[in-house]
Amino acid sequence: MPTETLQTGSMVKPVSPAGTFTSAVPLRILNKGPDYFRRQAEPNPKRLSAVERLEADKAKYVKSQEVINAKQEPVKPAVLAKPPVCPAAKRALGSPTLKVFGNHAKTESGVQRENLKLEILKNIINSSEGSSSGSGHKHSSRNWPPHRSEATDLHRHSFAESLKVYPTQGRRSPQEGGSHVGRRLLEQSAESFLHVSHSSSDIRKVTSVKPLKAIPCSSSAPPLPPKPKIAAIASMKSPEADPVEPACGVSRRPSLQRSKSDLSDRYFRVDADVERFFNYCGLDPEELENLGMENFARANSDIISLNFRSASMISSDCEQSQDSNSDLRNDDSANDRVPYGISAIERNARIIKWLYSIKQARESQKVSHV
């Protein structure tokens, strides 16, 4: 064995149990006694407030004996006093019999409310059934009574009256006359239909009937007469409306009024401009004389005698049917007439083509003169 281990072993001394206890617990705790441990064992040790500490040291800073003897209590918030409860009431509240009685009262009140609601519903159902059944027949049987009651007749009569369309006062055009005839037929059919039918679904059918519209002309229908000119319409009307009616048709402004001479001048100028543009491709008379009228023979055959006018779909259909009927009757005369129905695109293309031909004619004349 080495000598170092022997020396360390000889230096170690045995330790007594008393020495271990004194080293683990300090001496100042042992000197405090058992009261120290009791105070630590208490859950919340009471601490003195500032008032209590001042009360204990009052003799140090107060001279009069009266103040020293007087004890100052801390100010506490006022506690609201509860109303006193009788002991009998306490026992009654605490007993289970009262709770059971309260539950029974609640259930009885709920049952009464439900019964009241059921009675109200029954009354409503009975009243609706009585009003709908009329003379006591049920809806399930679907057998109508032989005679209607006065109330239902009055109601249906008022409903039929509400469907009527009364004519407005004023002048009537010949086209409006046919519509009034259609309205009368509709009224008569509606009245008869209402008196015959009994169910609400039939009445709904009457209300869904739309007003009659003007039936467009088909190929088999007779053609409408052509529209009269403005001058003819103005001559047919009364002399009082003469200065007002043409102005409305021309200027579309009812407040603007023009004299007859001004209107005729405007019509003449418009016709002249249209003729110059479509017949002579917008050229002045001097240019036409220089170029020669023979260059416009083809233009005159295609464009000169065409009647350009705007028309609605109904009038165009009627005119086409009129043309077809007249073609069947007069085949020879149809070949001599100028064809109708050239579109605006084709018309513009012809105008552009003739303008181009005039330009080429000018260039050829310049080349020939040179």
Swiss-Prot record:
Pfam families hit by this protein: FAM110_C (PF14160), FAM110_N (PF14161)
Annotated positions of the Phosphoserine modification: 238, 301
Keyword Signal included in the entry's annotation: no
Principal location: cytoplasm
Chain positions covered by the region annotation Disordered: 127-151, 237-256, 317-337
InterPro entries per UniProt: FAM110 (IPR025740), FAM110_C (IPR025741), FAM110_N (IPR025739)
Keyword Phosphoprotein applies: yes
GO cellular component term of the entry, any: centrosome
Swiss-Prot/TrEMBL keywords: Cytoplasm, Cytoskeleton, Phosphoprotein
Expression by tissue: Detected in thyroid, spleen and testis, and at lower levels in stomach, spinal cord, lymph node, trachea, adrenal gland, prostate, ovary and intestine.
Subcellular location: Cytoplasm; Cytoplasm, Cytoskeleton, Microtubule organizing center, Centrosome
Biased composition (Basic and acidic residues): 326-335
Family classification: Belongs to the FAM110 family.
Function as written in the Swiss-Prot or TrEMBL entry: May be involved in tumor progression.
Protein name: Protein FAM110B
